[in-house]
Amino acid sequence: MRYPWFRLAIFIVGCLFPVWWLYEAAMNLLGPDPGKIMMDRLGLGALTFLLVTLSMTPLQKLTGWSGWIVVRRQLGLWVFAYIVLHILCYLFFILGLDWGQLAVELRKRPYIIVGALGFLGLLVLAVTSNRYSQRRLGARWKKLHRLVYAVLGLGLLHFLWIVRSDLREWAIYAFIGAVLMVLRIPAVARALPKVAR
């Protein structure tokens, strides 16, 4: 296994935040609605991990270090893990497993549908993030995994729809996402190694 310490560091960071938030909830440090706080934090954590994942390719081009690419799949799976936990928090703490209420929520809060579409995209990416799928799909695998850009757009839209008024935090995430997209424009991507010199 290449770069085991780097992989271990990412694993520790990925585990650390949910464990810490659980501790805060157990100690009554998250206020009167800890379930919602945890749900929100997990959603932002997933978006953060997604942006970090998308930064791996530009970082590799800038530095020439292959370690960034090696951990990209691991980071992507953490995005999926955080989103699954985000959804579970919603189902248990917000919805109370009241499936009849779900239809009402979808009508009242269409941003949930946007989030669900993003989750489906992540599910496809997570299921196919393995060597078997790469061999099976061949050239189509790369095309399929461009779905991550749509997932980012859906995630940002979901976030924007929720915050509505105070857009400062959202704007930071959107700006970073926009920069990462610009760095993928072929002419810009080709120039990155030259900038590193």
UniProtKB/Swiss-Prot annotation:
Keyword Chaperone: no
Keywords: Cell inner membrane, Cell membrane, Electron transport, Flavoprotein, FMN, Heme, Iron, Membrane, Metal-binding, Transmembrane, Transmembrane helix, Transport
GO biological process, one term: protein repair
Repeat found in the keyword field: no
Compartments it resides in: Cell inner membrane
Cofactor(s) for this UniProt protein: FMN; heme b
Major site of localization recorded for this protein: membrane
Topology within the bilayer: Multi-pass membrane protein
Bound cofactor: record note: Binds 1 FMN per subunit. Binds 1 heme b (iron(II)-protoporphyrin IX) group per subunit.
One term of GO molecular function: oxidoreductase activity, acting on diphenols and related substances as donors
InterPro entries: Fe3_Rdtase_TM_dom, MsrQ-like
Transmembrane segments: 10-30, 42-62, 75-95, 110-130, 147-167, 169-189
Pfam families for the chain: Ferric_reduct (PF01794)
A cellular component term, taken from the record's GO annotations: plasma membrane
Protein function: Part of the MsrPQ system that repairs oxidized periplasmic proteins containing methionine sulfoxide residues (Met-O), using respiratory chain electrons. Thus protects these proteins from oxidative-stress damage caused by reactive species of oxygen and chlorine generated by the host defense mechanisms. MsrPQ is essential for the maintenance of envelope integrity under bleach stress, rescuing a wide series of structurally unrelated periplasmic proteins from methionine oxidation.
Family: Belongs to the MsrQ family.
Subunit structure, as described in the record: Heterodimer of a catalytic subunit (MsrP) and a heme-binding subunit (MsrQ).
Protein name: Protein-methionine-sulfoxide reductase heme-binding subunit MsrQ
Species name: Pseudomonas putida (strain ATCC 47054 / DSM 6125 / CFBP 8728 / NCIMB 11950 / KT2440)
